[in-house]
Amino acid sequence: MFRTLLKSKIHRVKTTQCELHYEGSCAIDEDLLDAANIVENEQVHIWNIDNGERFVTYAIKGQRGSGMISVNGSAARRAAVGDLLIIASFAQVHETDVATHQPQLVFVDDANRQVELRHHVPTQQL
């Protein structure tokens, strides 16, 4: 049996562009793609912290070191410049590998530069 588990997350990135008439996708600074282990054309889930919108698209490379997060195509109607987003991808993990699976969790500063990398989500407390 396979389970769908969180593979990658880029947490609280700031939207830098919205390009309605671009071909689609989400352009992500290549440094962040590398840190999160997300490849070009990989499906990503995007959750907008500011307005609650959730949508699925695919990742494309944004200029390395630029901090770019550009929501493109029809998804551009789901975000505005300055909105905080969570970008996530998932993987099918075999049951025998679930216990050792470690996602890449990337945390950024206000300029969308990586400041921390974790491999687990802490247990939520009351």
From Swiss-Prot:
Which pathway does the protein contribute to? Answer: Cofactor biosynthesis; (R)-pantothenate biosynthesis; beta-alanine from L-aspartate: step 1/1
As cofactor, the record names:
pyruvate
Coiled-coil ranges per UniProt: none
Please name the top-level EC class of this enzyme. Answer: lyase
For this UniProt entry, the molecular function terms from Gene Ontology, in alphabetical order, are: aspartate 1-decarboxylase activity
Q: Mostly located where?
A: cytoplasm
Cofactor remark from the record? Binds 1 pyruvoyl group covalently per subunit.
Alphabetic keyword roster: Autocatalytic cleavage, Cytoplasm, Decarboxylase, Lyase, Pantothenate biosynthesis, Pyruvate, Schiff base, Zymogen
Query: What is one GO cellular-component annotation here?
Result: cytosol
User: What name does UniProt use for this protein?
Assistant: Aspartate 1-decarboxylase
